[in-house]
């Protein structure tokens, strides 16, 4: 798994279950993660048909480039939060320097025949450090 250091700057995402009163976030299907050095990571989760042919499945994905979000994104900004980015062909993880996972993306949930890919965002962590 490839690993490199970055400084997290801003996360924009579409969230469902957003509580405007206490500014907390719950579920995301897509996100745009921006780093201080200008790198941009776009995350998404999509439904499809299982390769097994039995029902639907989900796939998580990520692309390293700038891409707009559809809809009205919610933005969480950080004062240059240092993070570790770990990536291989099927999984991406963004962790703080204490190894707490902030964002995880799995392309297929480690199951080829019944994929259950996902985007996991540690909203408690983001709410704590949000501007």
Which sequence ranges carry the predicted segments?
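Surface-exposed, interaction-prone regions used to assemble/regulate multi-protein complexes
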Residues: 1-131
